[in-house]
A protein has these predicted regions:
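Interfacial segments of alpha-helical transmembrane regions
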Residues: 1-9, 54-72, 143
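Helical transmembrane-bundle signal
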Residues: 8-18, 39-49, 68-78, 138-144
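Juxtamembrane "helix-exit" motif on the non-cytosolic side of transmembrane helices
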Residues: 18-27, 78-82
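Non-cytosolic membrane-interface motifs at loop->transmembrane helix junctions
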Residues: 26-37, 90-93
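Membrane-interface loop-to-helix entry segments
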Residues: 31-41, 105-108, 112, 125-140
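Flexible coil/turn and secondary-structure edge motifs
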Residues: 49, 57-61, 80-86
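Hydrophobic alpha-helical segments of small multi-pass membrane proteins
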Residues: 61-75, 93-101, 138
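Extracytosolic (periplasmic/ER-lumenal) interhelical loops and adjacent juxtamembrane/interface segments
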Residues: 83-129
Length: 144
């Protein structure tokens, strides 16, 4: 299998899996949503490189490598927050963004009902959260 096709397939599977978990009730935190962005970009870049392999693949390969390394770093940071190695952003613990007016306060109070803290994993398998698995998979894919 061509590397760009394999990268596309793995990336699509990762995104389908996390959306499925969200569909069945595992609510992601804000950092979890941000961890999806490199995968979305990798899907686009690898899909384009399937059709224009000879023209852009050498450049695309390096950009995809950087996205996987960045994804691994971000996922490692998030996993460290979940394991309480360090603190996350202030919005991870409180669920409130910068409040500038009474209307902002009311919106934040209403949004807290669906708030998921970043320091608590909503799903663990074999002791690792999805951030931990994202770290491992991004690291492996960056080596690939």
């Amino acid at each position: 299998m061509k590397p760009n096709l394999f990268i596309f397939f793995v990336s699509v599977c990762v995104i389908i899996f996390v959306h499925y978990l969200e569909y069945i009730g595992f609510t992601p935190c804000q950092l979890c949503f941000y961890q999806r962005w490199p995968w979305y970009l990798i899907i686009i870049l690898s899909f384009v490189s399937i059709f224009y392999n000879n023209i852009i693949y050498p450049y695309n390969k390096f950009i995809i490598f950087l996205l996987f390394v960045g994804s691994a770093a971000y996922a490692g940071w998030h996993a460290g927050i979940e394991w309480a190695f360090w603190q996350g952003p202030s919005t991870c613990a409180t669920g409130t963004d910068k409040i500038e007016s009474h209307d902002d306060l009311l919106e934040n109070i209403q949004s807290i009902q669906s708030f998921v803290p970043c320091n608590e994993a909503s799903f663990r398998f074999l002791g690792l959260s999805l951030a931990g698995y994202n770290f491992i998979s991004s690291l492996i894919m960056s080596i690939y």
